[in-house]
Amino acid sequence: MKILGIGNAIVDVLCKVDDEFLIKNSLTKSTMKLIDEAEIKNLLSGLTIQDTISGGSVANSVVGLSQLGNRVGFIGKVNDDNLGQKYEDGLKKEKVNFLYKKNSESTPTGTCLI
């Protein structure tokens, strides 16, 4: 491994929404809002997930470096849940050596709704 990144393992959950959904949920276009687990579950219950992608700024950077032909790794923490497995699979697909400890606590893998 030539390059190692350490960061937050966050699954990007891509969803298509209309203006009505944004208004109903007090969301504003082109902004970021921190929400808790209960609110994310509530939002996801009214959405159709288009795709899930391994994300987080450091992971995105090492994926880019991998695509340029570098041998890379990433250290992050995911939960032992469905999203944690998708995160791991996504990095493996991009040839990133994912060095992690799966957390078995009730806290879910970090998620970003896009």
Which sequence ranges carry the predicted segments?
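Glycine-rich phosphate/adenosyl-contacting loop at the front of the ribokinase-like
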Residues: 1-75, 93
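Glycine- and other small-residue-rich loops at beta-strand/loop junctions that grip anionic moieties
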Residues: 76-77, 102
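Short secondary-structure boundary micro-motifs
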Residues: 5, 85, 96-100
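A glycine-rich helix N-cap at a beta->alpha junction
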Residues: 90-107
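Short, basic and Ser/Thr-rich N-terminal targeting/leader segments
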Residues: 68, 107-109
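Short, electropositive alpha-helical surface patch
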Residues: 80, 84-93
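Short beta-strand scaffold segments in enzyme catalytic cores
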Residues: 111-114
